[in-house]
Amino acid sequence: METPITYFDELNPERNTLDRETIHQLRKGTKHLRAHLHLFRQLEGQQEETENLRTAVKKLARMLSVQRDADVLYSLLQNMISEADDAELVALMTELKQKLQDKRLPPSELKHVLGLTRDIKKKTHKLLGKEPAENDIKPILKLRLSELCENGEGILSSEITDWEELHDWCKQIKKLMYQHKMIRNQTPAELKIIEILDSLGDELGKINDQKILENFLQQQQLLCTRAYTHQLYQKLYSLISDYRQQHLCTCRNLLLNLMQLK
């Protein structure tokens, strides 16, 4: 069974920087662990030990979010540059990409992140010694899956206007995926549910990243004075919109597959 602690095990306490992959793994670890803690709360009510750990995990996620967003936006722009054939658009995206390179965790915060990670890892080892029974887990997951499918059908059935609602649904999808991984002896159907939830969460996450990129572009556009540069920004928004529609189409197909398994 995959556990949240695996995401923290490879972090080198002697390092003085965090690369993109390490940030990604730590963020996955915080999401996985919060999903566990949420299920514990449903089964056992609020316990001081789990609530303290939950607070620490949320704090770590917040500390990592700025660098994580910068890394993701850098990667998105890099991918768009590789696919673009407009030289002026490529030049603008390259300039924007350079502005993201400075968004790294300062040494003082990095030290705090490493200390917080060690503390979370130690407390998580204790927590994993008292996993809930699968017979208690499965009814909760079955009900939650049905609710999320129903919510998703309503959200994806028409044009998206509330992106925060879509992002919240994305977080719930990822949470449910990690909670399904708590089942030790997964059936073929449960493995398929995990696979679809994972793919759906990934597609929804890409849509949210594109919204973050749009917000970043809007901030940078405010600093522009040339009318032609504003036209280039409009081209960028159009590209992002096209990518987003592709991801939404994939999400709708994945949801249909998921609804057949609920």
Predicted feature descriptions by range:
Residues 1-262:
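Function-determining surface determinants
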